[in-house]
């Protein structure tokens, strides 16, 4: 293994453990990955306590989600196919993060019928690549949960034009965010999570019609 890949594993481990500390990866849930320069995806192994996540807990797979040496005998998470879809369809992306925060889980259910949560006026919107002002509205699409990952990826393909803001929600499940570097992916995740938390707090004051 290259020194660069080992370094990336250690960096992503630190991010994963931090997200667990923040309550965004309960009960061994969530998954994370990075793509190296040889188009090898290193994705987090299923069933590992994210508070204890270590570099050896990554599995190497190709862009179709098939395990590569020395991990051929290990079955990766079914959601690996979502990571593969993102890398295949958004050239230049090198990191994908998936969290299960309370805000993402609840709001994705509340607004599932609208197929998106829309944010406007937030200063942190400018943390999403390509956004230059808070004076705009930006949508985070919501997709129905589906245990069949091939079927789910077909949903993504059908609405791919909605995925240009580096994130989406799965109803009553969680958030996916990505970026051209690990730092950018983390920034995108933090922006979405912050705005979701703000909207959830706002619901406590003024519930929308969808929540009544």
Swiss-Prot record:
Keyword Lyase included in the entry's annotation:
yes
Cofactor(s) listed: Zn(2+)
Q: Keywords of this protein's UniProt record, alphabetized?
A: Amino-acid biosynthesis, Lyase, Metal-binding, Methionine biosynthesis, Zinc
Q: Give the EC number(s) under which this enzyme is classified.
A: 4.2.1.109
Which GO terms label this protein's molecular function in UniProt? methylthioribulose 1-phosphate dehydratase activity; zinc ion binding
Q: How is the cofactor bound?
A: Binds 1 zinc ion per subunit.
Looking up InterPro entries in the UniProt record yields: Aldolase_II/adducin_N (IPR001303), Aldolase_II/adducin_N_sf (IPR036409), MethylthioRu-1-P_deHdtase_MtnB (IPR017714)
Q: Which reaction does it catalyse?
A: 5-(methylsulfanyl)-D-ribulose 1-phosphate = 5-methylsulfanyl-2,3-dioxopentyl phosphate + H2O
Q: Where in this chain does the entry annotate a coiled-coil region? A: none
Which enzyme class, named as a word?
lyase
Name any GO cellular component annotation. Answer: cytoplasm
Pathway connected to this protein: Amino-acid biosynthesis; L-methionine biosynthesis via salvage pathway; L-methionine from S-methyl-5-thio-alpha-D-ribose 1-phosphate: step 2/6
- SMART domains linked to this entry: Aldolase_II (SM01007)
Provide the residue positions that the database annotates as binding Zn(2+).
Answer: 98, 100
Q: Which GO terms describe its biological process?
A: L-methionine salvage from methylthioadenosine
Task of the protein: Catalyzes the dehydration of methylthioribulose-1-phosphate (MTRu-1-P) into 2,3-diketo-5-methylthiopentyl-1-phosphate (DK-MTP-1-P).
Q: Which family does it belong to?
A: Belongs to the aldolase class II family. MtnB subfamily.
Tell me what this protein is called. Answer: Methylthioribulose-1-phosphate dehydratase
Species for this entry:
Picosynechococcus sp. (strain ATCC 27264 / PCC 7002 / PR-6)
């Amino acid at each position: 293994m290259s020194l660069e890949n080992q370094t990336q594993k250690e960096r992503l481990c630190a991010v994963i453990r931090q997200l667990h500390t923040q309550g965004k990866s309960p009960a061994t849930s969530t998954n994370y990955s990075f793509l190296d320069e040889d188009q090898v995806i290193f994705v987090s192994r299923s069933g590992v306590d994210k508070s204890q996540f270590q570099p050896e807990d990554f599995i190497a797979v190709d862009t179709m989600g098939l395990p590569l040496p020395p991990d051929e005998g290990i079955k990766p998470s079914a959601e690996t196919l979502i990571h593969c879809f993102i890398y295949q369809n958004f050239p230049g992306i090198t990191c994908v993060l998936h969290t299960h925060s309370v805000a993402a889980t609840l709001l994705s259910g509340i607004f599932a019928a609208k197929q998106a949560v829309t944010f406007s006026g937030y200063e942190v919107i400018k943390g999403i690549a390509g956004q230059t002002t808070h004076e705009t509205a930006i949508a985070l699409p919501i997709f129905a949960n589906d245990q069949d990952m091939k079927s789910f990826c077909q949903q993504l393909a059908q609405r791919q034009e909605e995925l240009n803001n580096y994130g989406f929600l799965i109803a009553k499940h969680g958030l996916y965010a990505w970026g051209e570097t690990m730092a950018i992916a983390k920034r995108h995740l933090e922006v979405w999570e912050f705005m979701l938390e703000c909207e959830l707090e706002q619901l406590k004051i003024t519930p929308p019609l969808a929540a009544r």
